[in-house]
């Protein structure tokens, strides 16, 4: 997208954008929650729709002149419902956290008990962390991973549900590399007369393509972001039934948000159309294949992975026995042009700003066009950067060479 208009008005911001574009182009982005949107998605976000205020919902706005943005939002809603086979969709949440807040407020009250995954075992801040609104407003009880398999302990989930009788059970994670059994969660929720919610922010693209089981047939509410594996703009989305839907709508507006971001909603519509295409399904299959290959290649080089592998787009490296922290690993890899994030591992003795692990994902490198052959090389580069930090510049040159073969945008009009 041509951003040359910025240069004459604000050269400092223009230079920041140019430097970030160069960083993304020349580096290996392996943060599991990051991806690269299409030019069409970016163009929608930079369109004249950013000028329009549109409080309310299609055909029920508090402002005039909303005919075109009504059409854009309706397209996004219809495409979300079609893609995920849901009765109801709300495309207005500004983020996944906002979507979760609205979902909670729709079906539970402050002080109610909720059962969700522990953050230190792979959950999310909005699943009851004490530093989040969720942990402050609701009584969260947490389940975790089996010490033996490092997978979700469904026996523990059932026992905690029976003991605490929560009003809501939440499944979904920010750092869990295995398939989640949504039906088993749903059965447990029904057994204690609880509602069931799924936060599928990380796996929405996989679900859309059918490479991960869908939570929609089993959950009362499903929330997600629209970026990550879905490869759209940064934002949120809520799916539910026609029965619960009106409660969600009123919590989003006027309960939590005011004016929706119509330029972002239009970009969501574009991304959802892309996600309905056969090429998107093939992309998601490659994401999973790349993750499996990368995981195996890392383990072949002596790395320890939580649960000994992956079923989805991400993996967790446990560095407890490597003599380095997650923070050190993030810095070593960063010096070599490889971007990851430090991440807690089960029973991590280190704090959240240090950690004993790193999280790695394949969505963005797959968007670049890389396949299984490249994943073996990526594993070698990761291993070298971690074990021989003095060779960082050598690794960085190899990273640049690899990335040059798989450019993010083949024409460089981002440079204005």
Curated annotation (Swiss-Prot):
It is found in: Cytoplasm. Its EC number is 2.1.2.1. GO terms for cellular component: cytosol. It catalyses: (6R)-5,10-methylene-5,6,7,8-tetrahydrofolate + glycine + H2O = (6S)-5,6,7,8-tetrahydrofolate + L-serine. Keywords: Amino-acid biosynthesis, Cytoplasm, One-carbon metabolism, Pyridoxal phosphate, Transferase. The keyword Acetylation does not apply. Pathway: One-carbon metabolism; tetrahydrofolate interconversion; Amino-acid biosynthesis; glycine biosynthesis; glycine from L-serine: step 1/1. The keyword Transferase applies. The record marks 227 as: Plays an important role in substrate specificity. (6S)-5,6,7,8-tetrahydrofolate binds at residues 119, 123-125, 243. One of its GO terms (molecular function) is pyridoxal phosphate binding. The modification N6-(pyridoxal phosphate)lysine is found at residue 228. InterPro entries: PyrdxlP-dep_Trfase, PyrdxlP-dep_Trfase_major, PyrdxlP-dep_Trfase_small, Ser_HO-MeTrfase, Ser_HO-MeTrfase-like, Ser_HO-MeTrfase_PLP_BS, SHMT-like_dom. It holds the Pfam family SHMT. One of its GO terms (biological process) is tetrahydrofolate interconversion. Its cofactor is pyridoxal 5'-phosphate. Its main location: cytoplasm. HAMAP family: SHMT. Catalyzes the reversible interconversion of serine and glycine with tetrahydrofolate (THF) serving as the one-carbon carrier. This reaction serves as the major source of one-carbon groups required for the biosynthesis of purines, thymidylate, methionine, and other important biomolecules. Also exhibits THF-independent aldolase activity toward beta-hydroxyamino acids, producing glycine and aldehydes, via a retro-aldol mechanism. Belongs to the SHMT family. This is Serine hydroxymethyltransferase. It comes from Desulforapulum autotrophicum (strain ATCC 43914 / DSM 3382 / VKM B-1955 / HRM2) (Desulfobacterium autotrophicum).
């Amino acid at each position: 997208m041509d951003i040359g208009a910025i240069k004459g008005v604000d050269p400092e911001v223009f230079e920041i954008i140019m430097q970030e574009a160069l960083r993304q182009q020349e580096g290996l982005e392996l943060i599991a929650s990051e991806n690269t949107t299409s030019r069409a998605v970016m163009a929608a976000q930079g369109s004249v729709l950013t000028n329009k205020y549109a409080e309310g919902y299609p055909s029920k706005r508090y402002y005039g002149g909303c005919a075109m943005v009504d059409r854009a939002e309706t397209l996004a809603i219809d495409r979300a419902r079609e893609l995920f086979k849901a009765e109801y969709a709300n495309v207005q949440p500004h983020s996944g956290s906002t979507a979760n807040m609205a979902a909670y407020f729709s079906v539970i009250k402050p002080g109610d008990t909720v059962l969700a995954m522990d953050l230190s075992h792979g959950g999310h801040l909005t699943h009851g962390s004490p530093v989040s609104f969720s942990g402050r407003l609701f009584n969260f009880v947490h389940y975790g991973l089996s010490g033996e398999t490092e997978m979700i302990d469904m026996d523990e989930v059932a026992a905690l549900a029976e003991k605490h009788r929560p009003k809501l059970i939440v499944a979904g994670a920010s750092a869990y590399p295995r398939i989640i059994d949504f039906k088993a969660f749903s059965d447990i929720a029904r057994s204690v007369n609880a509602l069931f919610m799924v936060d599928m922010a990380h796996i929405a693209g996989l679900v859309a393509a059918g490479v991960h089981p869908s939570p929609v047939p089993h959950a009362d509410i499903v929330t997600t972001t629209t970026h990550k594996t879905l490869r759209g703009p940064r934002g949120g989305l809520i799916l539910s039934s026609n029965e619960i839907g009106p409660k969600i709508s009123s919590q989003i507006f006027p309960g939590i948000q005011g004016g929706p971001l119509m330029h972002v909603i239009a970009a969501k519509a574009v991304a959802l159309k892309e996600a309905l295409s056969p090429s998107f399904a093939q992309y998601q299959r490659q994401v999973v294949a790349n993750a499996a290959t990368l995981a195996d290649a890392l383990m072949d080089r002596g790395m320890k992975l939580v649960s000994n592998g992956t079923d989805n787009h991400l993996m967790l490296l446990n560095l407890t026995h490597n003599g380095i922290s997650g923070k050190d690993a993030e810095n070593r890899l960063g010096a070599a042009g490889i971007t990851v994030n430090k991440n807690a591992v089960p029973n991590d003795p280190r704090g959240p700003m240090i950690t004993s692990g790193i999280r790695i994902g394949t969505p963005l490198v797959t968007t670049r066009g890389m396949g299984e052959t490249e994943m073996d090389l990526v594993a070698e580069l990761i291993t070298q950067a971690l074990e021989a930090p003095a060779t960082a510049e050598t690794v960085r040159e190899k990273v640049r060479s690899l990335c040059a073969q798989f450019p993010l945008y083949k024409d460089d009009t981002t440079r204005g």
